[in-house]
Amino acid sequence: MAELACFCYPHLENDSYKFIPFNSLAIKCMLTAKVDKKDLDKFYNSIIYGIAPPPQFKKRYNTNDNSRGMNFETQMFTKVATLICEALNSLKITQIDVASVLSRVVSVRHLENLVLRKENHQDILFHSKDLLIKSVLIAIGQSKEIETTATAEGGKIVFQNAAFTMWKLTYLDHQLMPILDQNFIEYKVTLNEDKPISDGHVKELVAELRWQYNKFAVITHGKGHYRVVKYSSVANHADRVYATFKNNIKSGIASDFTLLDQRIIWQNWYAFTSSMKQGNTLEVCRKLLFQKMKQEPNPFRGLSTDRKMDEVSQVGI
């Protein structure tokens, strides 16, 4: 995760701003600079290489002292920064909004995946500039639309029906901010269209999840799609989701946290996010993740058996 101010800076033209990507030498200069505390939140002028990010964001970049930041000297950083600027420059952003836009925290890996989709000549984003810009605006929180299958960050498709697409995320192969844990496995489920979904299509997805992914929890980050994650990583997701939710409220960022379909979401996660939306503390909400829940009447009871019998019936055909 990183603020948009880590990728670009605003330049006033007439009554609105044009956004310009940083270059790696300017960032490198900023990382070595001694800056007064009162200037830490201001864009840094490297004199030779142009404008650099505010020094308060030093920890967002990978250095000898900080291996958890972005690999900003890669080609991918330039590609992501340029793509962000293209999307922001498609909007008219004025003095009133520029600070809140640049302070927004975005998913670095999501944006790298959009670059990879853009560069894949078999992908719809390679052929449609409008859809690409729309996808980026959704990713950086400048659109109220949810991330659907067409505008998704992408990955490897492992399941699809008329209503849903399930992606295996490919963060292990990334340049900008790769996942270093080689045991990382995570999936995302997007809606093919933002419209009501039939019970039959929900049933197909639930059957797939129970049959193939019963060691994973289905959760949501509140952005209109599902995540399928290892149970061991649920607490980490909870901390991040709670922190983002509270930060958005503090920053005055209007964002609806969508709970999604309770029949699909892991029961404990649904309780956690419902409690969070009610304004409870992280400690109170977190307890719900590890609490034994009363089983709700399940409209899809026995689906795993149905799926198993259906697959057995195909043998010999």
Swiss-Prot record:
<dbReference type="GO" id="GO:0030430">
    <property type="term" value="C:host cell cytoplasm"/>
</dbReference>
<protein>
    <recommendedName>
        <fullName>Non-structural protein 2</fullName>
        <ecNumber>3.6.4.-</ecNumber>
    </recommendedName>
</protein>
<dbReference type="GO" id="GO:0004550">
    <property type="term" value="F:nucleoside diphosphate kinase activity"/>
</dbReference>
<dbReference type="GO" id="GO:0019079">
    <property type="term" value="P:viral genome replication"/>
</dbReference>
<comment type="similarity">
    <text>Belongs to the rotavirus NSP2 family.</text>
</comment>
<dbReference type="InterPro" id="IPR048306">
    <property type="entry name" value="Rota_NS35_C"/>
</dbReference>
<keyword id="KW-0460">Magnesium</keyword>
<dbReference type="InterPro" id="IPR024068">
    <property type="entry name" value="Rotavirus_NSP2_N"/>
</dbReference>
<keyword id="KW-0378">Hydrolase</keyword>
<feature type="active site" description="For NTPase and RTPase activities">
    <location>
        <position position="225"/>
    </location>
</feature>
<comment type="function">
    <text>Participates in replication and packaging of the viral genome. Plays a crucial role, together with NSP5, in the formation of virus factories (viroplasms), which are large inclusions in the host cytoplasm where replication intermediates are assembled and viral RNA replication takes place. Displays ssRNA binding, NTPase, RNA triphosphatase (RTPase) and ATP-independent helix-unwinding activities. The unwinding activity may prepare and organize plus-strand RNAs for packaging and replication by removing interfering secondary structures.</text>
</comment>
<dbReference type="GO" id="GO:0005524">
    <property type="term" value="F:ATP binding"/>
</dbReference>
<comment type="subunit">
    <text>Homooctamer. Interacts with VP1; this interaction is weak. Interacts with NSP5; this interaction leads to up-regulation of NSP5 phosphorylation and formation of viral factories. Interacts with host DCP1A, DCP1B, DDX6, EDC4 and EIF2S1/eIF2-alpha; these interactions are probably part of the sequestration of some host SGs and PBs proteins in viral factories.</text>
</comment>
<dbReference type="InterPro" id="IPR003668">
    <property type="entry name" value="Rotavirus_NSP2"/>
</dbReference>
<dbReference type="GO" id="GO:0017111">
    <property type="term" value="F:ribonucleoside triphosphate phosphatase activity"/>
</dbReference>
<feature type="binding site">
    <location>
        <position position="188"/>
    </location>
    <ligand>
        <name>ATP</name>
    </ligand>
</feature>
<dbReference type="GO" id="GO:0003723">
    <property type="term" value="F:RNA binding"/>
</dbReference>
<dbReference type="GO" id="GO:0046872">
    <property type="term" value="F:metal ion binding"/>
</dbReference>
<keyword id="KW-0479">Metal-binding</keyword>
<dbReference type="Pfam" id="PF21067">
    <property type="entry name" value="Rota_NS35_N"/>
</dbReference>
<dbReference type="Pfam" id="PF02509">
    <property type="entry name" value="Rota_NS35_C"/>
</dbReference>
<keyword id="KW-0694">RNA-binding</keyword>
<keyword id="KW-0067">ATP-binding</keyword>
<keyword id="KW-0547">Nucleotide-binding</keyword>
<keyword id="KW-1035">Host cytoplasm</keyword>
<feature type="binding site">
    <location>
        <begin position="107"/>
        <end position="109"/>
    </location>
    <ligand>
        <name>ATP</name>
    </ligand>
</feature>
<dbReference type="InterPro" id="IPR024076">
    <property type="entry name" value="Rotavirus_NSP2_C"/>
</dbReference>
<feature type="binding site">
    <location>
        <begin position="221"/>
        <end position="223"/>
    </location>
    <ligand>
        <name>ATP</name>
    </ligand>
</feature>
<feature type="binding site">
    <location>
        <position position="227"/>
    </location>
    <ligand>
        <name>ATP</name>
    </ligand>
</feature>
<feature type="region of interest" description="RNA-binding">
    <location>
        <begin position="205"/>
        <end position="241"/>
    </location>
</feature>
<dbReference type="InterPro" id="IPR048573">
    <property type="entry name" value="Rota_NS35_N"/>
</dbReference>
